[in-house]
Amino acid sequence: MTTTVLPELGFYTLPGQPDSSRDLIDEVRLGEQLGFGRVFVSERYNKKEAATLCGAVGAVTDHIAISTAATNHNTRHPIVTAGFARTMQSLTGGRFTLGLGRGIAPMQDAFGIGRITTAQMEDFADLMRRLFRGEVIIGHDGPAGSWPVLHLDATLDEYLPMGMVAFGPNTLELAGRCFDEVVLHTFFTDETTVRCVETVKAAAERAGRDPDSVKVWSCYATIGDHIAEEERLMKLVGRLGTYLQGYGHLLARTNGWDETVVDRFLADEVVSSVRGLDVVGTTEQLEHVATLIPDEWLAPAAVGSPAQCVAAVRNQLDLGCDGVIMHGATPAELAPIIAEYRATA
């Protein structure tokens, strides 16, 4: 029996830090069997290099759509990125979307990678579009960089779907102008989510585009009670704690949260001694961290029974999102929630 595809639902493969990159194979096969419409591939500089993971996803699936969410345009030469995207389109029969993001500024500073600007991403997106139309680009000198020649194939005339992981208003407006899908950040409040959707759609309309053609994905932590308590602690408290460590003030400003809470959080001895709470934090450490995070900050998530999770996911669609990424859990962990979603359609 063929499973009906749920195009409005997606998941991240290899959430958090996997024991092995090969875990992806069973995850995406099951995700496709369950009927997820799209799998999202994140990137970390260890066992989660995006091009490798995307190739593996494409090789072991038949119809699920695949998006990077996200890679950074300045960690590869533009021709390497364009070649990666074209190879993925060929491998998958056109199921691939190249998703970009700004990255994490402290990490970029530490590694000597330049910080990414809105102008750079807009310039880079235009370069990718031109390369996929078969253009020979001579002497480009723009915000994304300078190159003598950029060229893929003179016979190429394709449209490359592109996505954006967006946070602030400038990036959201850019996504509406130039991109095909937008992934919002985890732990956005309902008010923030509505504002982001409206910003994207309005920017698309001002650019003369059909607002419905730009798909906005809520990235929504979906952690059911059927998952062990220690794992739930890692996937919720550990994940939000890691975000607060990386860019807590930005997240607080975006949601209208009290930034002094972030200051106290970052000054805590346990928090300052553990980098990557969602990877290496112990249960004892995470229980302590939970006392530092207001309950309302953890509230924008799907938790509880499968029915409660489904209700929370559907609320994201009611807020105006075109799709929901059930974030932080594997397809196996999400299976009871998908079953409830189908049963109550």
Placement of each model-derived feature along the sequence:
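N-terminal beta1-alpha1-beta2 module of alpha/beta enzyme domains
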Residues: 1-68, 160
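An alpha-helical appendage that flanks or caps ligand/catalytic pockets
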Residues: 2, 115-152, 193-194, 198, ...
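Hydrophobic faces of well-ordered beta-strands that scaffold small-molecule active sites
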Residues: 7-13, 39-41, 65-69, 96-100, ...
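Active-site mouth loops of central-metabolism enzymes
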Residues: 8-22, 71-78, 156-167, 222-225, ...
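Conserved, mostly hydrophobic/aromatic
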Residues: 35, 57, 88, 128, ...
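Active-site-adjacent beta->alpha loops and helix N-cap segments on the catalytic face
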Residues: 47-56, 188-204, 332-336
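Alpha-helix-loop-beta-strand connector modules within alpha/beta enzyme cores
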Residues: 50-71, 75, 124, 131, ...
